[in-house]
Regions:
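Bacterial Sec-dependent N-terminal signal peptides
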Residues: 1-7
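Bacterial signal peptide processing site
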Residues: 24-26
C-alpha cells in the first residue's frame, strides 16, 4: 500500500494555498471547481511533485512507552488493512466516521491529542464532531490503549509545542517529519507519503511545458510582485516558498 497526499500551492491572478488530497491515484482529471454566486472558478493541478515528504505523529519525549505503542499500532493498521479502510472513507466510497472528544480531566486515563482541525481530509470538524484520517486513527489508537480520547484543537504552530510542554501526549495534524520539530517531539514511524504540487486556474498555461520541479521553480522565481502565494503558517508549503524565494534573493 502506498498512500500519497498532495498539498498544493495554488497559482492564479492571486496565488492561494489549498489542499488537494489523493490516496494512491488521481481523482478525475485533476480539475476542481469553486462556485461563488453565479461565477465559477476552475482549477487544475500541475502533476509534478515539488517536494517529497512523510507524515508521522509527534509523541511527547517523556513518554517512550507511548512512542513504541504508537509505532506498533501504525505497523498493525498498515498490515491488517485498517489504514486503507480509513483512507477509503475520504478518498473512496467509504463514509467518514465522526469522532467525539472527551473533556480533559487529569484524574482520568486519557490520550490527549493536539491537532489543528482545519486540514481536510486529515482533520476537520462538523458541529461538535471531529472527522479526518488522523482523527479516526486517534480514535482507534485510544481504544487500543484503553484510554479516553481527548482532542485539543489549536493553531497549527502550537501543535508540536503543546506536546513538547507536556500539555498533550501526541500531535496528530498531518505533520511532515522536520528537524526543527524534533526539538519538541519524537516522531513516530511514518504512516503517509506526501508532496507539494502547484494548482492554477484552468486557463493558465504558464506551466504546461514544465517537466520537473526545476522548470516550475524557474517560472515561479521569474514572477513579479503581482503574483502572490498563499500558505498556511507553519506548514511545509510555507517553508518551501520561503526557501525558494530566499534562495532566489541570495542568488541575486
Amino acid at each position: 500500500m502506498k498512500l500519497k497526499k498532495y498539498a498544493t500551492l495554488a497559482l492564479s491572478a492571486i496565488l492561494a494555498l489549498t489542499a488537494l488530497t489523493g490516496c494512491g491515484n488521481q481523482a478525475d482529471n485533476g480539475d476542481s471547481k469553486k462556485t461563488s454566486g453565479s461565477s465559477k472558478i476552475t482549477a487544475k493541478v500541475i502533476e509534478i511533485d515539488l517536494t517529497d515528504e512523510e507524515y508521522a505523529f509527534g509523541v511527547d519525549k517523556e513518554q517512550e512507552d507511548l512512542l513504541k505503542e504508537v509505532n506498533d499500532f501504525i505497523a498493525e493498521i498498515k498490515e491488517d488493512g485498517t489504514l486503507d479502510e480509513i483512507c477509503n472513507n475520504y478518498f473512496g466510497d467509504g463514509t467518514p466516521q465522526a469522532v467525539t472528544s472527551g473533556t480533559l480531566d487529569n484524574s482520568k486515563d486519557q490520550l490527549v491529542v493536539a491537532t489543528n482541525a482545519a486540514f481536510e481530509p486529515f482533520e476537520y470538524t462538523q458541529g461538535d464532531s471531529y472527522y479526518g484520517i488522523d482523527m479516526e486513527i486517534a480514535s482507534r489508537l485510544a481504544d487500543k490503549l484503553g484510554k479516553e480520547l481527548v482532542i485539543q484543537n489549536m493553531d497549527f504552530d502550537a501543535v508540536c509545542l503543546s506536546v513538547g510542554q507536556q500539555k498533550c501526549d501526541i500531535a496528530m495534524a498531518g505533520l511532515t517529519i522536520k528537524e526543527d520539530r524534533k526539538e519538541y517531539v519524537n516522531f513516530s514511524n511514518p504512516y503517509y507519503s506526501a508532496s507539494q504540487r502547484l494548482i492554477v486556474t484552468s486557463d493558465n498555461t504558464d506551466f504546461d511545458s514544465c517537466t520537473d520541479a526545476a522548470s516550475i521553480e524557474e517560472i515561479l522565481k521569474a514572477e513579479d510582485s503581482s503574483v502572490k502565494v498563499g500558505v498556511q503558517t507553519g506548514t511545509t508549503g510555507q517553508f518551501y516558498c520561503c526557501l525558494l524565494y530566499t534562495s532566489d534573493a541570495a542568488d541575486d
